[in-house]
Amino acid sequence: LSTDCISEDTLKDSGAEHYCIKYARAYRQNINWLKTFPCNIIFIDGNHDNHEFWAKLPTESWNGGQVQRLPDAPNVIHLMRGEYYTIDGLTVWCMGGAESIDKATRTQGVSWWPEEIPSQKEMWHGMDTLEEHGYDVDVILTHTMPRMLMSAYFGNSFTLKENDPTGVYLDEVYRRTRFRKWFCGHMHEDIDKPLFRLQVLYDDLVSIDTKNPGFESTEQEARHGEEGKDP
């Protein structure tokens, strides 16, 4: 999801990208491209990020919460798990990470990291920051979604992902928190159900009008330029 890419404005990603990998040429190409953006690019981690890499980086305070910057592209900013920010006038709470259902086919430390699942400390920290703000926030950004909503969105398509402890944790966040919109990724589909105020993103970009008191969002095709796609 994104705002206008001007001055202090920001592009946001729900944890689908993992540039810190051991493929030097592709990594360098991506970094050189990201550095050209005249704005901050902020993201939450997913389940395929190199979590060991990010764990070694220093943190700093940014817009009310802790972040990490990519050393080779300082405009690329990692929003950390359980942190609470004010961005473009909106309050934002974040929780990256999720369980990989294909981890048995991956190699630990190369294509899979056990830290993909938020730790108990990170989960408690997330609840503490929400409690400090009265369980009230404009936007929630997570990689995966609450487990209790999966069947409403996908039927029986993602039963393996229902065992993810991250989704169980997010059930409690969903129950306790007053929020205006929740965005997540992980499912590799684009689907929005206004009844639940949660939108799953994959190819779509969402532009939030921060000046609109109704907090309306508009969808655009992100990569493929397809026309006439169902909402």
What kind of feature is each model-predicted range?
Residues 82, 88-96, 214-219:
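Short, surface-exposed amphipathic charged segments that create phosphate/polyanion-binding patches used
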Residues 31, 127-131, 171:
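Short hydrophobic/charged patches on amphipathic alpha-helices used for structural packing
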Residues 5-11, 65, 88-164:
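Active-site-proximal loop/helix segment associated with metal-binding centers of metalloenzymes
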Residues 224-231:
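Long, low-complexity, intrinsically disordered segments
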Residues 1-3, 47-49, 82-83, 96-99, ...:
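Active-site metal-binding loops of divalent metal-dependent hydrolases
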Residues 1-86, 159, 166-167, 175-176:
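Core catalytic region of metal-dependent phosphoesterases/phosphodiesterases
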Residues 40-44, 55, 59-74, 145-219:
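Conserved beta-sheet core of the metallophosphoesterase superfamily
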